[in-house]
């Protein structure tokens, strides 16, 4: 019995032309015959040469290769809810931090100014070449052939990511010049389609009186692609020379009555601003932003997409252009178009534009008022799959990238480093946007279906083992920010219970509400029944529900993305940050009911200092509640003392990490001195003593002094200090009486 030889199976669409293959194979019959190996190799080489000659003769009829992607080598398996093509993503990491707020120890998610931005191609919709006479309509993508080579856009999502690819970028009018951009990350949409000689399947954007005429530009024979296989560029004009196009000329094209020229001008601006930062200022000075905003009202989808992409790149990391876009009513026009259009490519550019705009303080109020309803109703709620059963909202198909951009727009970024406080405090910042601003938080919490949709999406991804989905990260950062000061800003059952408990203590106390008993109540050192949970939480009720806590802990146990881990820990940190009943209730849910301490303790082993800081601060908040001391002692003490023993203090977060660790150890050792004694090594004590003397880390120094003072006050632990050669006088010199009195009174 003869077996058929093994061959490589590729997709059918790759072989619509029988010669379109990377390997020319002999026929099955020849493979089965007794020909020698040498002869078969010779036949294969001849067939390959013949195929290449055949392809070269056809190069004038195909505008690009069958692998229609502007970028190569990118993959992240991001395929949830995808359409006919695949989407590939990779990411660049941005750091995180905190800023002190006088009462709470919570966080708001922030990103530094060096934000990750992305670039993707729209080759699927813009790279088809329609031969003369093939159809008489102008579809979305049939007007412009030249611009198929130079369309790129970028956004500034505040994401952690791990760079996996490089941008191979050919300069305009040059051949395949490659540049590695390590600080960038890119996601591309690969159509996987070859050029097909047929009419476009998408609905036409406008009627054309005659078929477009495609002629090669005189001086446009060089490759203009970004890491794309070389193909000839063509435009629908007799005289346009792509290599001679300049920013002033492109801005003039924007005012042309010909829609093809409008699109060419906008795409050239988009492409040039992607490559050259100085082009943004030039377009601004020439009044191009006003013209691009006007083009968002064009009836032609090609022009709409080109204008949105150009604005997206123009405002990227340019505050001047962002403010000018707002001044020209660009936000309202973008939101209006997003509300009207069903074109996924236009939606991607518009949501990317709104994301870029959302990083500027001056625009946040207008974005909250105008953009939030459209982003929620047209993108986030439909894509998440959440439904309350009473809504008549349309369930349109939403592209995953549009959802990613929309959640990124709601996600906050901060320009200043946040600080964790020594006493229970939340972090805030002077630079905020949508979900981080006070008014923005309240508006988003009150928006019907928004929190429900974000939570539903995260829970669905956790259930499907897609914990590293990049939109999960965005959703978690929004939920993290919405949990900030939740107990103070949102009426909860904990607040009512606390009010009842305060009244009960006041009635029993003869010394009034400012007695020691009242202070004891405020510090949660008393037993009080926790409120019953809602069976079906809605809106802000989700933020402190046990189902949400369970979801966060599951993510912390399964996700490998540092930004997601930090957001989960930050949300829990905010919930445990107050000095009221909510902190006690949330801490009990996390540590006792959901048994989440092992997941939190693992965060302290992370190589990312932002993750370690969030985990250490969360444990510090939880350690204030004596009910948790026993369970925390066995599960947390080893990891926390390891931080004090081995942490080098060479990161920007070291002071926050060490101060949180000192307070956690201080709280736990008070109830379990014998357990603490097992983990107090000489190296740990030496580090604590060095911290006391440190002038570079005042917060950590004060926390270390308090820890030493409490150790000396404990009969079980005083001997440990004496063994290291310390006495009362030396300890007094290290601690400093004034600072000790001040900090002790704060506790």
UniProtKB/Swiss-Prot annotation:
CC annotations in GO: adherens junction; cornified envelope; cytoplasm; cytoplasmic stress granule; desmosome; ficolin-1-rich granule membrane; intermediate filament; nuclear stress granule
Region (Required for binding to single stranded DNA): 1-234
Sequence segments annotated as region (Disordered): 48-68
Gene Ontology MF: a single term: intermediate filament binding
PTM-bearing positions, type Phosphoserine: 4, 118-119, 121, 142
Disulfide bonds: none
Post-translational modifications reported in the UniProt record: Phosphorylated by AKT2; required for interaction with YWHAG and subsequent localization away from desmosomes to the cytoplasm. Phosphorylation of Ser-118 by AKT2 promotes PKP1-driven cap-dependent mRNA translation and decreases intercellular adhesion, phosphorylation is promoted by insulin. Phosphorylation by RIPK4 at the N-terminus is required for its role in differentiation of keratinocytes and DSG1 localization at cell junctions.
InterPro entries in the record: ARM-like (IPR011989), ARM-type_fold (IPR016024), Armadillo (IPR000225), Plakophilin/d_Catenin (IPR028435)
Residues covered by region (Phosphorylation in this region is required for cytoplasmic localization and protein stabilization): 54-69, 116-191
Superkingdom per UniProt: Eukaryota
Record-stated family: Belongs to the beta-catenin family.
Noted disease: Ectodermal dysplasia-skin fragility syndrome: A form of ectodermal dysplasia, a heterogeneous group of disorders due to abnormal development of two or more ectodermal structures. Characterized by features of both cutaneous fragility and congenital ectodermal dysplasia affecting skin, hair and nails. There is no evidence of significant abnormalities in other epithelia or tissues. Desmosomes in the skin are small and poorly formed with widening of keratinocyte intercellular spaces and perturbed desmosome/keratin intermediate filament interactions.
Binding partners and assembly: Part of a complex that contains DSG3, PKP1, YAP1 and YWHAG; the complex is required for localization of DSG3 and YAP1 to the cell membrane in keratinocytes. Interacts with DSP. Interacts (via N-terminus) with KRT5/CK5, KRT8/CK8 (via rod domain), KRT15/CK15 and KRT18/CK18 (via rod domain) as part of intermediate filaments. Interacts with VIM (via rod domain). Interacts with DSP. Interacts with DES. Interacts with FXR1; the interaction may facilitate the binding of PKP1 to PKP2, PKP3 and DSP mRNA.
Protein name in the entry: Plakophilin-1
Species: Homo sapiens (Human)
Underlying gene: PKP1
């Amino acid at each position: 019995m003869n077996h058929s030889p093994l061959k490589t199976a590729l997709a059918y669409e790759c072989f619509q032309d029988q010669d379109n293959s990377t390997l020319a194979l002999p026929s099955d019959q020849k493979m089965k015959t007794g020909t020698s190996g040498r002869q078969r190799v010779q036949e294969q080489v001849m067939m390959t040469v013949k195929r290449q000659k055949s392809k070269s003769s056809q190069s004038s009829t195909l505008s690009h290769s069958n692998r229609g992607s502007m970028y190569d080598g990118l993959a992240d398996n991001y395929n949830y809810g995808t359409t006919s093509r695949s989407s590939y993503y990779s990411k660049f990491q941005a750091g995180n931090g905190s800023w002190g707020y006088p009462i709470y120890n919570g966080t708001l998610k922030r990103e530094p100014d060096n934000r990750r931005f992305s670039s993707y191609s729209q080759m699927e919709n813009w790279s088809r070449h329609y031969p003369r006479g093939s159809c008489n309509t102008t579809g979305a993508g049939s007007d412009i052939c030249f611009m198929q080579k130079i369309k790129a856009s970028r956004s500034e999502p505040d994401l952690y990511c791990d760079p996996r690819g490089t941008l191979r970028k050919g300069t305009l009018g040059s051949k395949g010049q490659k540049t590695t951009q390590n600080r960038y990350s890119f996601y591309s949409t690969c159509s996987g389609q070859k050029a097909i000689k047929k009419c476009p399947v998408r609905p036409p954007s406008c009627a054309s009186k005659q078929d477009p005429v495609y002629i090669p530009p005189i001086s446009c024979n060089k490759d203009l692609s970004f890491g794309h296989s070389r193909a000839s560029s063509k435009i629908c004009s007799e005289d346009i020379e792509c290599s001679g196009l300049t920013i002033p000329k492109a801005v003039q094209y924007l005012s042309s009555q010909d829609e093809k020229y409008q699109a060419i001008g906008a795409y050239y601006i988009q492409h040039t601003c992607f490559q050259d930062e100085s082009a943004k200022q030039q377009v601004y000075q020439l009044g191009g932003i006003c013209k691009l905003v006007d083009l968002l009202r064009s009836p032609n989808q090609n022009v709409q997409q080109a204008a949105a992409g150009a604005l997206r790149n123009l405002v990227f990391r340019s505050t001047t252009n962002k403010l000018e876009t707002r001044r020209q009513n660009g936000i309202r026009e973008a939101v209006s178009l997003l509300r009207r259009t069903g074109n996924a490519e236009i939606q991607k550019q518009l949501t990317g534009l709104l994301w870029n705009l959302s990083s500027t303080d001056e625009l946040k109020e207008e974005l909250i008022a105008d953009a939030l309803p459209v982003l929620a109703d047209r993108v986030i709620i439909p894509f998440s799959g959440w439904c309350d059963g009473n809504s008549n909202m349309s369930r349109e198909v939403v592209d995953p990238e549009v959802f990613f951009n929309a959640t990124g727009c709601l996600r906050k970024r901060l320009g200043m480093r946040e600080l964790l406080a020594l006493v229970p405090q939340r972090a805030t910042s002077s630079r905020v946007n949508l979900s981080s601003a006070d008014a923005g938080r309240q508006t988003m919490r009150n928006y019907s279906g928004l929190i429900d949709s974000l939570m539903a999406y995260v829970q669905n991804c956790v259930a499907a083992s897609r914990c590293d989905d990049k939109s999960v990260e965005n959703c978690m950062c929004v939920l993290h920010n919405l949990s900030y000061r939740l107990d103070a800003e949102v009426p909860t059952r904990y607040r009512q219970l606390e009010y009842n408990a305060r009244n009960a203590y006041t009635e029993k106390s003869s010394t009034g509400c400012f007695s020691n008993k009242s202070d004891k109540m405020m510090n949660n050192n008393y037993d009080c029944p926790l409120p019953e949970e809602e069976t079906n939480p809605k809106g802000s009720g989700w933020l402190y529900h046990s189902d949400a806590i369970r979801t966060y802990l599951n993510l912390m146990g399964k996700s490998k993305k540092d930004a997601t881990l930090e957001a989960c820990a930050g949300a829990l940190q905010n919930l445990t940050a107050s000095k009221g009943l909510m902190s006690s209730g949330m801490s009990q849910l996390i540590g006792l009911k959901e048994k989440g301490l092992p997941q939190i303790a693992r965060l302290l082993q992370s190589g990312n200092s932002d993750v370690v800081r969030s985990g250490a601060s969360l444990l510090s908040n939880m350690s204030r509640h004596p009910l948790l001391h026993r369970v925390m002692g066995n599960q947390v003490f080893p990891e926390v003392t390891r931080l004090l023993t081995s942490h080098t203090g060479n990161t920007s977060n070291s002071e926050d990490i060490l101060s949180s660790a000192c307070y956690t150890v201080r709280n736990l050792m008070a109830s379990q001195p014998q357990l603490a004694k097992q983990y107090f090594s000489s190296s740990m004590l030496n580090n604590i003593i060095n911290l006391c003397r440190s002038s570079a880390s005042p917060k950590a120094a004060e926390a270390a002094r308090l820890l030493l003072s409490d150790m000396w006050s404990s009969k079980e632990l005083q001997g440990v200090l004496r063994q290291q050669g310390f006495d009362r006088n030396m300890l007094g010199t290290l601690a400093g009486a004034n600072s000790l009195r001040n900090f002790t009174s704060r506790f």
